[in-house]
Design a protein with these regions (language model features):
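N-terminal adaptor-interaction module of cullin-RING ubiquitin ligase components
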Residues: 1-144, 151-155, 162-169, 173, ...
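CRL adaptor-proximal regions
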Residues: 1-16, 340, 370-387
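Amphipathic alpha-helical interface elements that mediate macromolecular binding in regulatory proteins
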Residues: 15, 19-23, 42, 141, ...
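Short loop/helix-cap segments at secondary-structure boundaries that form the rim of catalytic
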Residues: 47, 195, 345-349
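Leucine-rich repeat
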Residues: 49-52, 66-70, 90-98, 106, ...
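Short, solvent-exposed loop/turn at the beta-strand->alpha-helix junction
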Residues: 76-84, 105-113, 133-141, 158-166, ...
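Leucine-rich solenoid repeat scaffolds
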Residues: 316-375
Length: 387
C-alpha cells in the first residue's frame, strides 16, 4: 500500500476463522498490518475486506477532542493517491460502510475514477468530508453517482457544489437520517429544498449556513416532521416566523440550537413553550432580544429540559436564574458564560456567589462545572443520581 511493511505474518489458521472472528483480530491492527495479514493468503485477500470503516483521524488526540479533526496528524491525513486507491480496491468484496475524512489531500477525483471505487461506495452508509479541499464539484459528483444507501451525510466547511448536493440528497432521500452541513457557507436556500424529500430525517444541522433564506428552512421543516435534532446556529436570518414553524411541525424535536439567531424574540420562544414541552436541550445563546419573560415561560412549561444555554442574552436578570432553578427539575446544565453574564445579568462574581449562597436550597447545589468555561453550571447531585 505504498509503504514498506516491516512485519511478517504467518497466515496459517486464519483462513479457517469465520469473518466475524477474523474481524475481531483485524480491529486490533493498523491498516498496514491488516493488509500484511490479508495479503499473506490469497483466499483471505479475496474473501475479506481490508476495512469497511475508514476514519482518517485518530479520535483521541487533543485536536480531535476539540472537534478540529482536520488538524489531526496521527492517521491518514498525508496519505497519497496510491494509498487511497489501494484502500478502495481492497475494501471489496463487501465495500465501505463508513468513510470519515478530514483534510485528506490525497483523496481526490482521480481516486474516485479508479475501477475499484464504484464497488467500494455501493454500500456506503456514512459519509463525512471535513475540510477536504480536493472535494471539488467533479469529486463530489462522482461520489453522488456511486452512493444510494447513505444514512448519514456530513459535509463540513466545504464549498459544496449544488448539483452534486442535490444528487446526493435525491438518490439517498429514503435512507438519510442525518444531514450535517456545518460551515458550508456557499449553500443557498434552493440548495437545501431537496431535503424535503427526506421524510425520515432525524437530525439536521445548518450551522453557519447564513445564506439560506427563511422560506427554504420553513419548506424543509414542513416536510421533515420526524426531526429530533435541529441546529440553526449562526443561521442569523432565522426569526420568530421560522421558530413558529418549528413549533408547529416538529413535534418530535428534542434538541434545538438557535444560537445567534438574534432576530428571535420572546414571541418565538413562547411558541416553542406552547408546542414543544418535551424539549430536552435548548440553546438560545446570543439571542439578545430575549427578556426575563421568555425565560420564565421556559421555566414553567419546558419541565423536561436537561440543558439550557443562555450565554449572551444581555437583557436577562437574576430573576431568570431563580425561575429556572425553581421550575426546571430535570435541568443538569445551565450555560451563563461570559463577562457580560457576570456583570450585566448576575451582577459580577461576588453577586453570583451571594445568589448561590442565599438561595442554596432553591438552586439545588448549582456549581461551576469542571472542565467547562466559567459560567457553565451543573447540578452534581442530579448528575450522580442519573448515572
Amino acid at each position: 500500500m505504498n509503504k514498506t511493511l516491516s512485519i511478517s505474518v504467518a497466515s496459517h489458521g486464519f483462513e479457517t476463522l469465520a469473518s466475524e472472528s477474523l474481524r475481531l483480530v483485524l480491529d486490533y491492527l493498523t491498516i498496514y498490518e491488516q493488509f500484511a495479514l490479508l495479503s499473506s493468503n490469497k483466499e483471505l485477500l479475496n474473501r475479506e475486506p481490508l476495512a469497511s470503516v475508514v476514519v482518517s483521524y485518530c479520535e483521541r488526540c487533543s485536536a480531535c477532542r476539540k472537534r478540529t479533526e482536520h488538524l489531526c496528524t496521527n492517521k491518514f491525513k498525508h496519505q497519497t493517491k496510491d494509498f487511497w486507491t489501494a484502500l478502495l480496491q481492497y475494501s471489496n468484496p463487501t465495500g465501505l460502510v463508513e468513510l470519515r475524512l478530514a483534510s485528506c489531500d490525497g483523496f481526490d477525483s482521480d481516486v474516485l475514477k479508479s475501477s475499484q471505487a464504484k464497488a467500494a461506495f455501493m454500500s456506503l452508509q456514512v459519509l463525512e468530508l471535513n475540510k477536504c479541499s480536493t472535494m471539488n464539484a467533479e469529486a463530489l459528483g462522482l461520489i453522488a453517482d456511486m452512493c444510494s444507501t447513505l444514512k448519514e451525510l456530513r459535509l463540513r466547511d466545504l464549498a459544496v457544489d449544488p448539483v452534486a448536493l442535490n444528487k446526493l440528497i435525491t438518490k439517498n432521500a429514503e435512507s438519510l437520517r442525518v444531514v450535517d452541513l456545518l460551515g458550508c457557507h456557499t449553500i443557498r436556500g434552493e440548495d437545501i429544498r431537496t431535503l424535503a424529500q427526506c421524510s425520515q430525517l432525524r437530525d439536521l444541522s445548518l450551522w453557519g449556513c447564513h445564506n439560506v433564506d427563511n422560506a427554504s428552512i420553513e419548506h424543509v421543516i414542513q416536510h421533515c416532521s420526524q426531526l429530533e435534532r435541529l441546529n440553526l446556529r449562526y443561521a442569523h436570518k432565522v426569526d420568530d416566523k421560522v421558530v413558529a414553524s418549528i413549533a408547529l411541525h416538529l413535534k418530535e424535536l428534542k434538541d434545538l440550537n438557535l444560537r445567534y439567531c438574534y432576530k428571535v424574540s420572546d414571541k418565538g420562544v413562547a411558541s416553542l413553550c406552547e408546542s414543544l414541552p418535551r424539549l430536552r436541550s435548548l440553546n438560545l445563546s446570543q439571542c439578545a432580544r430575549l427578556t426575563d419573560a421568555a425565560i420564565m415561560r421556559v421555566a414553567t412549561s419546558m419541565t423536561c429540559l436537561k440543558e439550557l444555554r443562555l450565554w449572551g442574552c444581555i437583557k436577562l436578570t437574576s430573576n431568570s436564574v431563580l425561575s429556572i432553578s425553581e421550575g426546571l427539575p430535570e435541568l443538569t446544565l445551565l450555560d451563563l458564560r461570559g463577562r457580560d453574564k457576570f456583570e450585566a445579568v448576575i451582577g459580577g462574581p461576588t453577586a453570583l456567589k451571594f445568589l448561590i449562597e442565599t438561595y442554596r436550597s432553591k438552586l439545588a447545589r448549582w456549581e461551576q462545572a469542571q472542565g467547562e468555561q466559567m459560567g457553565v453550571f451543573k447540578r452534581p447531585s442530579m448528575i450522580a443520581a442519573a448515572a
